[in-house]
């Protein structure tokens, strides 16, 4: 799934054992991607929101702050009447709010609402399935909670209504991403009913995007995705000698560890017998990647013991 993690243990082993070059493509590199496939910190490319605007692929959205459903309905009506064949997406926090907004706006525009608790009912305009909902003709408004956040292609959607404060920056970026693609030169608009909290979070994202648009910012961001790299950086900058836990101590140098200095309690060794398909390199590889995926700093030491 976009390089976040391998979908099955079998697939994971195949990927690990392959010497082929691996290219990971993801729109959300915020979930330990570097742990999963051991991405090279020197070989990467970031296509930012800022660059996509410059390349005229997407357009920066405009925000409008409103404080009532009545005012929101007025803005939606103005936008949709001005722009024929354009659709509006309304994001609600639960099924109750979806039904409430559906009742109000369906009086003016052809509306479909989608939620896991609904049944596919063409007559009422409420659906459980996105595909079933999109089969309806002449839709102008789509109301949902999470169903349209990703995996849905609606280039004609240029108006987004956020009825509540979205919980995370990643979810907000995905949601706004539904309406920013260039389409018929229409500027996307966001109607925010959450006292500008969504707009402020969006501006924080744009500051972040500007930061990773620079060479130093992008390199720092890529490095920060790996806890292993952060731990190593901390150790590298730690004093060579220091005093803590009532002892004078020398900094641990992982590059010069002597395997003979490592003592493993025999009670912790539970290796009893080998199966017919046992492989020591594969066992070590599994242990290495399990620890690496958890964010541990792991070093493989090859010796003759």
Role assignments for model-derived ranges:
Residues 1-2, 147:
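Walker B catalytic acidic pair
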Residues 4-57:
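Post-DEXD/H (motif II) to motif III coupling segment of the RecA-like Helicase ATP-binding lobe
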Residues 19-21, 57-61, 109, 155-159, ...:
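Short glycine-/polar-rich loops that comprise or flank the Walker A/P-loop
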Residues 41-100:
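Conserved interdomain linker/interface between the two RecA-like ATPase lobes of SF2 helicase motors
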Residues 95-115:
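Conserved helicase motor "Helicase C" RecA-like lobe of SF1/SF2 P-loop NTPases
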Residues 119-218:
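Conserved RecA-like P-loop NTPase helicase motor core
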Residues 185-276:
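Long, hydrophobic alpha-helical segments
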Residues 259-305:
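Accessory helical-bundle/CTD segments and flexible terminal tails appended to RecA-like ATPase motors
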């Amino acid at each position: 799934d976009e390089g976040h993690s391998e979908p099955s243990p079998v697939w994971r082993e195949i990927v690990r054992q392959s010497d082929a070059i691996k290219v990971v493509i993801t729109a959300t590199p915020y979930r330990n991607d570097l742990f999963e496939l051991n991405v090279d910190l020197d070989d990467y490319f970031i296509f930012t929101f800022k660059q996509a605007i410059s390349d005229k692929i997407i357009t920066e959205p405009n925000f409008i702050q409103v404080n009532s459903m009545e005012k929101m309905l007025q803005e939606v009506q103005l936008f949709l009447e001005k722009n024929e064949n354009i659709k509006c997406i309304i994001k609600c926090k639960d099924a109750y709010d979806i039904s409430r907004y559906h009742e109000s706006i369906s009086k003016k525009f052809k509306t479909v609402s989608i939620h896991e608790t609904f049944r596919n009912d063409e007559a009422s305009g409420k659906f459980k399935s996105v595909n079933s909902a999109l089969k309806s003709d002449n839709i102008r408004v789509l109301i949902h909670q999470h169903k349209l956040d990703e995996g849905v292609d609606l280039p004609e959607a240029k108006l987004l209504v956020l009825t509540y404060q979205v919980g995370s920056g990643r979810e907000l970026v995905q949601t706004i991403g539904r309406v920013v693609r260039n389409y018929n030169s229409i500027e996307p608009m966001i109607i925010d009913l959450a006292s500008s909290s969504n707009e402020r979070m969006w501006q924080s994202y744009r500051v972040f995007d500007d930061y990773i648009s620079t060479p130093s910012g992008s390199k720092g961001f890529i490095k920060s995705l790996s806890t292993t790299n952060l731990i190593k950086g901390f150790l590298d900058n730690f004093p060579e000698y220091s005093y803590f836990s009532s002892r004078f101590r020398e900094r641990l140098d992982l590059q010069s560890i002597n395997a003979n200095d490592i003592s493993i309690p025999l009670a912790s060794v539970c290796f009893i017998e080998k199966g017919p398909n046992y492989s020591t390199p594969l066992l070590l590889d599994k242990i290495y990647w399990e620890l690496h995926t958890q964010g541990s700093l792991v070093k493989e030491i090859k010796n003759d013991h």
